[in-house]
Curated annotation (Swiss-Prot):
Belongs to the FBPase class 3 family. Its EC number is 3.1.3.11. Its cofactor is Mn(2+). This is Fructose-1,6-bisphosphatase class 3. InterPro entries: FBPtase_class3, Metallo-depent_PP-like. It comes from the Bacteria. Pathway: Carbohydrate biosynthesis; gluconeogenesis. It catalyses: beta-D-fructose 1,6-bisphosphate + H2O = beta-D-fructose 6-phosphate + phosphate. Transmembrane segments: none annotated. The keyword Hydrolase applies. The lineage of its organism: Bacteria, Bacillati, Bacillota, Bacilli, Lactobacillales.
Length: 638
């Protein structure tokens, strides 16, 4: 019945057999075009400026295209074209200041000519229909004329030159250059994979999401920081307290108030009444005067204690999480704490709101604070839009073009088998474990009430739990970092996965269990910064696990030595991209240098991949089969 209805609906899209034949020819032709370029990036962490720069430059792809398209140009000319494509408005403003009218006219003519040539070069792997869709409507006709005149007989050269000259004469050169730049930026990246962690640490998560919402093709693999926000939206007060504590720690809590309309009044009033300024709780980032440093340290302490109380409540009502070793508030009144066989003194104490008899119970005022934050967060229109976007485009893992993408890890035992997580009498491991968590994340986010339940508790566990595929460590040592001086207690032990992923056998085991060809598939993994300064490589698993961490978070750039790795997969294979820290447009313009370097990482010769070999190709083949069936079995009425 469903199939019959499907074909009835399909018939309505066509008025004749000729239209079906045309569509079949079109789809089968598309299958033979080279596959589009995929771009993989992870761990953006609210760093809008760095991400925006990467996308504007195509992660170095645009410069490579310029090298291939214009081998005769010198490095200065290539750098100028590359910068103008990435930052056309800035480049145009600089030119206007530096050149007179005649020089500017010549520059416009040369730049438009080069940008048309580059656009044509980038468009050569796409159908005309797809190219047309990427053009700005107001200049679509003009750009198409210029694109398809290039390389034609000499008698059209004057026609070509006249179009450009007339655009300059009519004072539309700047507008056209900006339109061409946007078109090139769209063409060099066909699809974006965000391999987790858009939120936290950086202050511009909202701008990151708004930028990504305009991407023409994109997917997410959720990270633990993303699920923290999803959990907060679903009603987990432990998630709410944590994400606001992190915002205070990294100095962007005021940004949440401004951008998302969060009401902070109850929180700030409570914090100033019950906590004293404490330099140990000053924000790690941001430019604040002394009054604000002191105020934020009070807020930071209040949120920290509320978080530990709420986490304790989750741990106590979910014994299957096996996290009793993270219950510390029972002991804090003694001024020391027992970890394993050793006792440690506590420093920076701020436990005055902890009741020795009921350490995990919120006071009435604390409950009012967290209720206010939760209500404000869950009813923010912008947060609703961003959460729904991440849910719609996201998942715990993705199989795309025969590659496996996930953020954190696949929990393993020391022997290399899938580790099991037991919940309500059922055991989950490997692919089933990721599916289990995704089901509860979607259920938690879909419910209309703010009540905490198993779904919201499991979302919190995804953020912090020992067997969470998004976290992958034995413990999150937040308490130890705040209150114990001995740095040995701050270490977070890794799941065996992170050691075993160096082995080819581990890559093959995981790929096989996810139903993929272990010889020709790859794992793309985010979450952990690659410490280049210590000699670490992003290529693991015998070359079949590629670890990317966008490295955009400034908090990690000192330890990694770079601004991270991202990944490109075009029709020829994979290229890994090394990024240096982005210092701003002014610095880039003055230096006229590249902030990225690309390196092909598969040494063996591989056949060039067409769309027919991709996930999209599989869908197009299905459409062709359906149309052929329709053509053979039904007469289309006029």
């Amino acid at each position: 019945m469903y199939k019959e209805k499907y074909f009835e609906e399909l018939k309505k899209e066509f008025n004749s057999e000729d239209e079906i034949v045309t569509e079949i020819v079109n789809l089968e032709a598309i299958l033979n075009l080279p596959k589009g370029t995929e771009y993989f990036i992870s761990d953006i962490h609210g760093e809008y400026d760095g991400l925006n720069h990467i996308l504007k430059t195509g992660a170095g792809i645009i410069r490579e295209k310029i090298n291939d398209c214009f081998p005769e140009m010198n490095e200065t000319e290539k750098n100028e074209l590359n910068f103008t494509v990435a930052y056309p408005k800035y480049a145009l403003e600089k030119r206007q200041l530096e050149q007179d009218a005649e020089e500017l006219t010549q520059w416009y003519f040369g730049m438009i000519t080069r940008m048309i040539g580059l656009t044509q070069f980038c468009a050569s792997k796409y159908s005309r229909s797809k190219v047309r869709k990427s053009l700005p409507p107001k200049y679509a006709y003009i750009i198409e004329e210029l694109l398809y005149v290039e390389g034609s007989p000499k008698n059209k050269q004057k026609y070509y030159e006249q179009i450009i000259s007339k655009i300059i004469e009519l004072d539309r050169a700047q507008d056209l250059i900006q339109s061409l730049a946007g078109t090139i930026q769209k063409m060099v990246i066909d699809h974006i994979h965000i391999v987790g962690d858009v939120f936290d640490r950086g202050r511009k998560s909202n701008q990151v999401l708004e930028l990504l919402e305009h991407a023409h093709s994109l997917d997410f693999q959720w990270g633990n920081h993303d699920v923290l926000w999803l959990g907060g939206y679903a009603g987990s007060q432990a998630c709410i307290a944590t994400l606001f504590r992190i915002a205070t720690r990294y100095g962007y809590i005021y940004d949440l108030e401004r951008e998302y309309g969060i009401n902070l009044r109850a929180l700030f009033t409570f914090a100033t009444q019950h906590y004293q300024a404490n330099p140990a709780f000053y924000p790690k980032a941001g430019d604040f005067d002394q009054n604000n440093l002191d105020l934020l340290s009070q807020v930071h302490q209040a949120l920290t204690i509320i978080q530990f109380k709420l986490e304790g409540q989750v741990i106590k009502r979910q014994p299957e999480f096996q996290m009793d070793d993270r219950l510390f508030l029972d002991e804090v009144q003694q001024g020391k704490i027992q970890l394993g066989d050793q006792e440690y003194p506590l420093e920076n104490g701020c436990f005055q709101m902890v009741d020795a008899d009921h350490p995990y119970e919120l006071t009435k005022e604390e409950q009012e604070v967290i209720d206010s934050l939760s209500y404000s967060f869950r009813h923010s229109p912008k947060i609703k839009v961003h959460v729904n976007f991440i849910l719609e485009k996201g998942s715990m893992y993705l199989i795309y073009n025969n590659n496996l993408l996930y953020h954190g890890c696949i929990p393993l035992t020391e022997d290399g088998d899938f580790d099991q997580f037991e919940y309500h009498g059922q055991k989950y491991a490997g692919k089933d474990l990721l599916t289990f968590f995704e089901r509860h994340i979607r259920a938690g986010a879909a419910k209309k009430t703010s009540d905490e339940d198993d779904d919201t508790d499991l979302m919190w566990y995804c953020w912090i739990g020992k067997k969470s595929p998004l976290f992958g460590r034995t413990a999150m040592t937040t308490f130890e970092r705040y209150f114990i001086a001995d740095s040995a207690t701050h270490k977070e032990g890794d799941n065996p996965y992170f050691k075993l992923r160096d082995r080819l056998s581990t890559a093959h085991y995981i790929l096989r269990k996810f139903g993929l060809d272990e010889r020709n598939s790859y794992i793309i993994n985010g979450h952990t910064p690659v410490k280049v300064s210590e000699g670490e490589s992003p290529i693991k698993g015998g070359g079949q696990i590629i670890v990317i961490d966008g490295g955009l978070s400034k908090a990690y750039q000192k330890s990694t030595g770079i601004a991270g790795y991202t990944l490109i997969n075009n029709s020829y294979g994979f290229q890994i991209v090394t990024h240096m820290p982005f210092q701003g447009i002014d610095d880039l313009y003055e230096s006229q240098t590249q902030s990225t370097s690309l390196k092909r990482i598969i040494d063996r010769d591989l056949p060039r991949r067409n769309i027919a070999d991709t996930t999209i190709g599989t869908e197009l083949k299905r459409q062709v089969d359906d149309l052929k069936y329709l053509l053979e079995t039904d007469e289309i009425s006029h």
